[in-house]
Amino acid sequence: MKVNFNQSFKDFKGKTMGLTIADEVGKVLFNISTSGNMPLSAEEKYMAYKLCNKMTNGEEVEVSSEEAAFLVKICGEYLTAGAYGQVRDLIEG
């Protein structure tokens, strides 16, 4: 599926914030080392790195179902409820 992460987050009133989803989720993916209390495997870390690069270097990017599930899982752990909801809605369409 193609997803455009270069959109601004919105606050609780629906006003556009200065933060893009690509930049904020990209930071999480670039810096992640654990999921919950468990360390990520080398493959998961590499997937996070590749997703970070895709998201921050393109308008609309191709995301596999495995990558989408990984993003939903990671964002659910590391983002606020409002940010997580926006990312999940974007991915799940």
Where are these regions (language model features)?
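Positively charged, low-complexity terminal tracts
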Residues: 1-93
